[in-house]
């Protein structure tokens, strides 16, 4: 057994030298091919160049099936195959082994986000509703906010104000809530790199803000302008009782402060800021669900987040298209995506740009909201 361990260590060293930037995917019959393929695609989309499919014994057929599936879909190509026949003291027998070395296909696009986690709203008569009247799962909806941190004004921010006011919310209080929470987030994270920033909670928020059950904020230090930390910041609030359409599953609002195009000299810098904001959004969503899973807060899991085209209208850079903004949002979300805590992502209709961006950047299938695969 000790010899097998030494041989494995030696082989791993050889693999790292011959195939830099590689990941070993252990193939087991305890996992479905669908799960293994999704994992392989996520690794490739995340920057891995080589996938090494490794299986023993009864996993060999599954290993070959996985290789064939990845190759047929232009995800990866075979560069090397190794077979082995090793003796294991644990069962006093020889076991066949297989390693299939695959390199990312040059035409591979893909996404770290599982296709089953993404859906798109169909074209509405006017606008995609902020919340459905009969939701079948717990959902939060993104509000494209601004640097003043108020709820109201124009576009979807005005629609949020109207909807929440109609259900009894004191919408004017959200601005002071967000400013207090932002101040706390900045104080606790001002010297940290973005990947070290922690989401902060407003303790006992319902005492001062009775419409709110929970309030969370995550800042994006790289987008700070002078003393202004608002750009790129994300706020999650869950409602205490006054739910939109009187449905408890319409659980909360996600207030996102996207970048303003007029504040950027180049369209590239603007789109980079959109990308960073979307990454921060996804991280905040995962942080919330992570707190729920670890029972650090007694709240329900957010099953779905409906996402609008923030920074894609009045705030859009004059040289950027809506499709450019949608691509940056999708790519940013993919960077922050974590399969376990991430909610499903439902994209509001906006000239079909989210669906077009998904197909163009990933080449993957699409789903309509509350519809079967098309």
Curated annotation (Swiss-Prot):
InterPro entries: Alba-like_dom_sf (IPR036882). Transmembrane segments: none annotated. Keywords: Cytoplasm, DNA-binding, RNA-binding. Disruption phenotype: In sexual stage gametocytes, genetic disruption causes a significant increase in the number of activated male gametes with no differences in total gametocytemia, sex ratio and mature-immature gametocyte ratio. Typical coordinated arrival of the sporozoites to the salivary gland from the midgut is affected. No significant differences in the prevalence of mosquito infection, oocyst numbers and total number of sporozoites per infected mosquito. No significant growth defects in asexual blood stages. It is found in: Cytoplasm; Cytoplasm, Cell cortex; Cytoplasm, Perinuclear region. GO terms for molecular function: DNA binding; RNA binding. Coiled coil: none annotated. GO terms for cellular component: cell cortex; perinuclear region of cytoplasm. Belongs to the histone-like Alba family. Possesses DNA- and RNA-binding activities. Binds to DNA with relaxed sequence specificity. May associate with the subtelomeric TARE6 repeats. Regulates the abundance of transcript sub-populations in a stage-specific manner. Regulates activation of male gametocytes. Participates in the coordination of sporozoite development in the oocyst. This is DNA/RNA-binding protein ALBA4. The gene is ALBA4.
